[in-house]
């Protein structure tokens, strides 16, 4: 039976034992990758500066997912929030990684067992002795078990009843920590940025899954529906499973890219929309204005801005600035952030405060334009000096820093003023170390961007897979010439193979 390479998976089509085996082996590979990747990331992760060099700047991918579920400590003696730990306990980052690797090994052995012992009695019909699977019953069992897991996660892990809780932070990603979360049963639970919705939705969805599972275990599908949806065909299971997976992938791509309580900015980095909308800039100005209203000086007001908040307001942390094929972490792009230089305030010779127009997300270069409080252009860095009217030299622009390392320092030299005006296009100004990692100065995306791109791409691919396999099972008689009501099953690898002349096409 010469199967082409793209149809080799049909060998498990009517072999439940080996179908289970290959799925267990797949689980072993996934769990093994997760544990190994976690150990690799822990080997290269630098926990020394959680403010200016957080996990998402270092390109960590699996550490943020462990952290949002309540893991914060390492056997190396450090905590993700900074400081040292004396007793991290079993469920540290390394402990979780090790558990995944051990689970992977057990799955590997189980896969081998099921491959060798494939012809089990449980796969045979008691009445006829022929191979058969009660797929609606199996669906009910799986739905019930997944409902129990979903309910347990929401009712115990997230709420802290039996578990650590989840990562919760303020709207500006400054005070994040792992804590128990109470379910939000009101309308606020539908706000994607309310952590309580995670608990309540898992409890509700889990309850629904348990009830639906019990329903499918106790109620048989009508014959017309069973035949119409080909419920006796394992490819129907494949098609509907792919549908569930691609739907979930589309959903999480959205919650990651647009932001939600499940994707905190402290763990995955800010979203592009927070730059586009000046989200952090507005909060910084609000805090400064409040300080000035309390009779603080500019220097005092700006010095009270958390460095963490200022760092979010920097275009280099925008996940949409990274090119699609630029490999590496953000630190490999613009460098490792060392310190905030402070907020530059530009003034012309008449004393007007000027604001540098910020670079939009999808621009690589952008003209340096300084406007006043009314939006009128007062200064720029001209492309052609011969025709300039608003150059820094002509307008007499100066810059003074408030807060940060250059607090109180002012410059009137045009070359220096223009240098900081160019850098102010990119948000708050930071000193960046490019030497340590040989950073090339080209922006990279954060794990938020990678996750979104990967899941959106695979969701699209799996959508077509759902259409393909759904069509194959619904129109099997048209595509393969096989009677859709044919329920005869023979040994694995020798039945229902397109292109195989030995496949029976009609029931006797």
From Swiss-Prot:
It is found in: Plastid, Chloroplast thylakoid membrane. GO terms for biological process: photosynthetic electron transport in photosystem II. GO terms for molecular function: chlorophyll binding; electron transporter, transferring electrons within the cyclic electron transport pathway of photosynthesis activity. The modification Aspartyl aldehyde is found at residue 348. GO terms for cellular component: chloroplast thylakoid membrane; photosystem II. Keywords: Chlorophyll, Chloroplast, Chromophore, Membrane, Photosynthesis, Photosystem II, Plastid, Thylakoid, Transmembrane, Transmembrane helix. Binds multiple chlorophylls. PSII binds additional chlorophylls, carotenoids and specific lipids. The chain crosses the membrane at residues 21-36, 101-115, 140-156, 203-218, 237-252, 457-472. It is a multi-pass membrane protein. One of the components of the core complex of photosystem II (PSII). It binds chlorophyll and helps catalyze the primary light-induced photochemical processes of PSII. PSII is a light-driven water:plastoquinone oxidoreductase, using light energy to abstract electrons from H(2)O, generating O(2) and a proton gradient subsequently used for ATP formation. Belongs to the PsbB/PsbC family. PsbB subfamily. NCBIfam families: PS_II_CP47 (TIGR03039). PSII is composed of 1 copy each of membrane proteins PsbA, PsbB, PsbC, PsbD, PsbE, PsbF, PsbH, PsbI, PsbJ, PsbK, PsbL, PsbM, PsbT, PsbX, PsbY, PsbZ, Psb30/Ycf12, at least 3 peripheral proteins of the oxygen-evolving complex and a large number of cofactors. It forms dimeric complexes. This is Photosystem II CP47 reaction center protein. The gene is psbB.
